[in-house]
């Protein structure tokens, strides 16, 4: 008896894609060419199950996404960024915004940065030149920053709009993403403005610091002030008229002259020995000039001194103050070895005990060693 025929084998079941295969296909997307990606995207958009897929994605999003209804639409402005903007505007680096500020904007455009609108000194000219360089660098970098921010924002917006065709992306979410991008770029903007402010402050401290200006007197101004100081060493307190004259000769202000004399007196008291050589130079120069002008016929190389037995003061011509140095230098007897000049008489302003007058009675206005106060 013949055996029954065997049934035909059933066709193999279609192979189901597991998770690893799906992930492999997803990872392969990055290796696709642009034409392949466009073809796959077009096929997906035309697929009959695409609306169902989109509906499922919307349901999943409603269950998992965090509601954004309670989030503020706009964050408050950064206080530190506002302070930096105000500082850059005050220094003339930022351009004032064209809003309803009227005269304030006009004044900001006409005033010279740094609070020196009418000062044409070398320091301020150099300051304005370097400030202009800082301003150019700042605006160049700010323009690059703004361009990069615009390009990146446009790219992300286009990407989200394209993805919204496949997954639910609302316009509100796109706005939130743009705001997050601007927040990231704001840190770069703040760093740029902070660096610019530090550069301006460093420039101001180097070129507009009043203490530095006092140290940078010209050689002519220093010569004028030193000559007056050592020629009036027994009373180095110039009057207001003398200060005006010294300021005019040295190209300084009266305040600078007053400060210089105050500092000079302090330094002289602290280290008198150090200034003896300098005093000899200036007093010798002044004595020669005064002798040539006010004492015609006097050819002596050394100054004569009154004898200890003299009963009257050293004679003063009508020039008065012009011969004050001669009297000061002649107030002490020269050493036995012979010397033209003695050390300067010590007045009360120098902190030493005044020497009694030997050439005239106490209280005589012509006394050489009488104590003098300001």
Curated annotation (Swiss-Prot):
CDD domains: homeodomain. This is Pre-B-cell leukemia transcription factor 4. Residues 103-209 are annotated as: PBC-B. Coiled coil: none annotated. Keywords: Activator, DNA-binding, Homeobox, Nucleus, Transcription, Transcription regulation. Pfam families: Homeobox_KN, PBC. It is found in: Nucleus. GO terms for molecular function: DNA-binding transcription factor activity, RNA polymerase II-specific; sequence-specific DNA binding. Residues 14-209 form the PBC domain. The keyword Manganese does not apply. Residues 210-272 bind DNA. The keyword Cytoplasm does not apply. Residues 333-374 are annotated as: Disordered. The gene is PBX4. Residues 341-358 have a biased composition (Polar residues). One of its GO terms (biological process) is brain development. GO terms for cellular component: chromatin; nucleus; XY body. It comes from the Eukaryota. It comes from Homo sapiens (Human).
